[in-house]
UniProtKB/Swiss-Prot annotation:
One annotated GO molecular function: proton-transporting ATP synthase activity, rotational mechanism
Ribosomal protein is among the record's keywords: no
Function per UniProt: Produces ATP from ADP in the presence of a proton gradient across the membrane. The alpha chain is a regulatory subunit.
UniProt-annotated location(s): Plastid membrane
Transmembrane segments: none
Name the record gives this protein: ATP synthase subunit alpha, plastid
Alphabetically ordered keywords of this record: ATP synthesis, ATP-binding, CF(1), Hydrogen ion transport, Ion transport, Membrane, Nucleotide-binding, Plastid, Translocase, Transport
Protein residues bound to ATP: 170-177
PROSITE patterns the UniProt entry points to: ATPASE_ALPHA_BETA (PS00152)
Binding partners and assembly: F-type ATPases have 2 components, CF(1) - the catalytic core - and CF(0) - the membrane proton channel. CF(1) has five subunits: alpha(3), beta(3), gamma(1), delta(1), epsilon(1). CF(0) has four main subunits: a, b, b' and c.
Provenance organism: Cuscuta gronovii
Higher taxonomy: Eukaryota, Viridiplantae, Streptophyta, Embryophyta, Tracheophyta
Length: 507
């Protein structure tokens, strides 16, 4: 017969009581009332906070956006096909955040920072809130360093500085993405981390951008965040914030970053869709009342940090699509008022063969010459004025039958200046090449050439200077000034090279 030893049992019970820790898990839970169109109505969740992450029993996550008296409106971060009415839901007590780190460079990810390029998982131990607060006034300093785009029209007349927000605006198929990708290509060897955010684009368009970056060796310093046209509206709305969180990580590590949002019109449309399904009151063009805040809190995160914070920078190039050149629509006017200038791409110029199709007359950079090196200021100061005078005279010349010689000369010069602004895609120019081209145009060296010969002559002149006069590029790169020696090299080289070129063209 088994004997029961009371003292042994009491010892075990005492030991268990000593090691017992009083741990109570309090969960804020709710029940699914209704689900559809990426929106879930939930009963319960009494203590949920606006913007809090919500977890459904089958693993899908969502964000609580509408806190109403009888239910909570949640937007889904996924398709939510397995969510059922009456299902259980719990609040996580966390706000949406994404992993960040150097491991993301060269990868293509979605709005939840999950890789979609088929190259395996990305290991990262650091996290950042998707919706981080922007740096305050004392955390910033004024912009003084140029961010070279490699596009002569922008770098000479609409300069962009590190930490600036410059809007790229224009109709569809006017080369907006091409301007942005060329800017990424030009950051090679400039120690700038690039983030390209594709919102609601065709998968083929994103694949084309990724292929271009890969072929040109630019993907190694670029992160691509992509949510395609078939993605959930919530993910299209979140994608720019995910891109900004990744760029901020590098900015606070004292690095320079460039972020491109392609494009914010589609993000606004996704947000409008979410808001209307949540039954928020519609405003102008059926957008919700806080659509301005949607873009302002995103673009204010771009900054040039103060010396105390390491002088890192985040430059934003948001893209906005217009309908038939209407820049007075709701989203274009909102983003124009938030940014530090805009580059306007014109369908008429694009169709006339001027690529990039930048309308210099109405494009502006509010940072201006503070974002230019001294050499560019010295050479390009006359360029915008001469082009403006030419545009005015060209409009007048359509009605005038006979023009005096001075006006004819001005027209001829203007046509040649406009010709030197033409550039093929994925072929950014160095600062020295831009200065050489502008100097040749402004000082009349191109006046005796036919319009069709200008591009070829400038390419040959650039090749000649690189091989035979490398000192010119050295001066520009080292002193950042257009010195007398640099000018003497151009004065000596351009006429002799032009004579040789014209002779070859005649043969």
């Amino acid at each position: 017969m088994v004997t029961i030893r009371a003292d042994e049992i009491s010892n075990i019970i005492r030991e268990r009581i000593q090691h017992y820790t009083k741990k109570i898990n309090i969960l804020n839970t709710g029940t699914v009332l209704q689900v559809g169109d990426g929106i879930v109505r939930i009963y319960g969740l009494d203590e949920v906070m606006a913007g809090e992450l919500i977890e459904f029993e089958e693993g899908t996550k969502g964000i609580a956006l509408n806190l109403e008296s009888k239910n909570v409106g949640v937007v889904l971060m996924g398709d939510g096909l397995r969510i059922k009415e009456g299902g259980s839901v719990k609040a996580t007590g966390r706000i949406a955040q994404v992993p960040v780190g150097d491991a993301y460079l060269g990868r293509v990810i979605n709005a939840l920072a999950t890789p979609i390029d088929g190259r395996g998982e990305i290991l990262s131990s650091e996290f950042r809130l998707i919706d981080s607060p922007a740096p305050g006034i004392l955390s910033r300093r004024s912009i003084y360093e140029p961010l070279q785009t490699g596009l002569i029209a922008i770098d000479s007349m609409i300069p962009i500085g590190r930490g600036q927000r410059e809007l790229i605006i224009g109709d569809r198929q006017t080369g907006k993405t091409a301007v942005a990708t060329d800017t990424i290509l030009n950051q090679q060897s400039k120690n700038v981390i690039c983030v390209y955010v594709a919102i609601g684009q065709k998968a083929s368009s994103v694949a084309q951008v990724v292929t271009t970056l890969q072929e040109k060796g630019a993907l190694q310093y670029t992160i691509v965040v992509a949510e395609m046209a078939d993605s959930a509206a919530t993910l299209q709305y979140l994608a720019p914030y995910t891109g900004a969180a990744l760029a901020e990580y590098f900015m606070y590590k004292e690095r320079h970053t460039l972020i491109i949002y392609d494009d914010l019109s589609k993000q606004a449309q996704a947000y409008r869709q979410m808001s209307l399904l949540l039954r928020r009151p519609p405003g102008r063009e059926a957008y919700p009342g806080d659509v301005f805040y949607l873009h302002s809190r995103l673009l204010e995160r771009a900054a040039k940090l103060s010396s105390k914070l390491g002088e890192g920078s985040m430059t934003a190039l948001p893209i906005v699509e217009t309908q038939s050149g209407d820049v007075s629509a709701y989203i274009p006017t909102n983003v124009i008022s938030i940014t530090d200038g805009q580059i306007f791409l014109s369908a008429d110029l694009f169709n006339a063969g001027l690529r990039p199709a930048i309308n210099v007359g109405i494009s502006v950079s509010r940072v201006g010459s503070a974002a230019q090196i001294k050499a560019m200021k010295q050479v390009a100061s006359k360029l915008k004025l001469e082009l403006a005078q030419f545009a005015e005279l060209e409009a007048f010349a359509q009605f005038a039958s006979d023009l005096d010689q001075a006006s004819q000369n001005l027209l001829a010069r203007g046509q040649r200046l406009r010709e030197l602004l033409k550039q093929s895609q994925s072929a950014p120019l160095t600062t020295a090449e831009q200065i050489m081209s502008i100097y040749a145009g402004i000082n009349g060296y191109l006046d005796s050439l036919e319009l069709g010969q200008i591009g070829k002559f400038l390419r040959e002149l650039s090749d000649y200077l690189k091989v035979n006069k490398p000192r010119f590029q050295e001066i520009i790169n080292s002193t950042k000034t257009f010195t007398e020696e640099a000018e003497a090299i151009l004065k000596d080289t351009i006429p002799s090279e032009k004579d040789r070129f014209l002779l070859e063209e005649k043969i």
